[in-house]
Amino acid sequence: MKITINREHCVDGLQKAGNVTPARAATVMLKTTWIRTDRAGKSITLMASNGYTEYLGTYPAEVEKDGFMGVYGKSLADLLRALPEGSVDMFTDRRGRNLVISQGSRLYKLPASNREWFQPLIPFPGTGTVGWSGEELLDIIDRVFFCILDDEDSPLGCLCIHPEENGGIDFCGLNGCRAALVRITNSALHGKLPGEGILIQKKYLADIRRLISPGEIEIGLTPRRFFIRNRGARDMVSVPLAQFAYPDYSVFFDRMKADTCSIVRVSRSEFSDALARSLIFNTRDENSVAISIGKDSLTIASSGKSTGSATETIAADCRSTVEHLVFVTRILAELLSHFGTGSLTMRIASGTGPCSFHTDTDENYAVIAMPESAPVTGL
């Protein structure tokens, strides 16, 4: 193999491949980035897999001699990122035991991986793909991710993508004390989803966030995998689907539509700013904020034995039979950070029951959170 690449063109793909291969993998096989050249296509293909997530990237290159080899992915990515901009030559030595990288007077060698370790990647489905926006997908993942349980052995450790009878698609995350739901309309994707929906584990969502660009993308589905590639097919990522039975999340969100719920409307930005200041007065053991609900205001208070106390009152429109709520300050502040500006609506089932949050500017996004059962003391 003998090629010349432009460092700026390929470093992104090498970094993505390196991000897939775990640095602490038990075997060198799972740390390998594989490089296949295509002289006719004037390109190289980068391939990496951690045994679950698979990445394939195609980048331009001047190919003098075709070849195929694997090297430790993180080392190659780190080296290319550390080199100055410009052309970089790569070739195998005579015995094929090393990949030689040179740029001007700089010369480096990386040992080659055993070719027998290579496992072919699963190809992108040839038919039935769906066009979408990478930016929208990443935004949805971000809005739901924090509500997904950190448990690989539970269905609650997954993002649920479920088609609804009205043509909508739900993206839901649950963790036992919080739930997030984004609902979109995409008729093409709706038609490709199985009736029971699909589940993607949280750890693979993290891979998607690292590897997908915000431009136009194509989605592919098989019974076992979820595929994403950009429209130019330069980068492709696929992750396995989980095979759990997901709970019926609709019962939680339907409960929050009941006429018996108390309703509070408040400025999201004012509420968030007050929580940020209250957080200053929290400690590791005293980490909650007390919210008192009046007719036209919310009083937000927190304290710590060693930090003092904070009390703020902000305007609100309240129709509530619930007078007091308690939340862990940091959790509530993080929750609100996923909403845009404008008026925030809270629907409250009871003082110790669930509360739902949504804004007037985004009716298709809602989060449910459970308050703390014990009141804040010392205020």
Task: List each model region and its residues.
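Structural preference for solvent-exposed beta-strand-turn elements
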Residues: 1-379
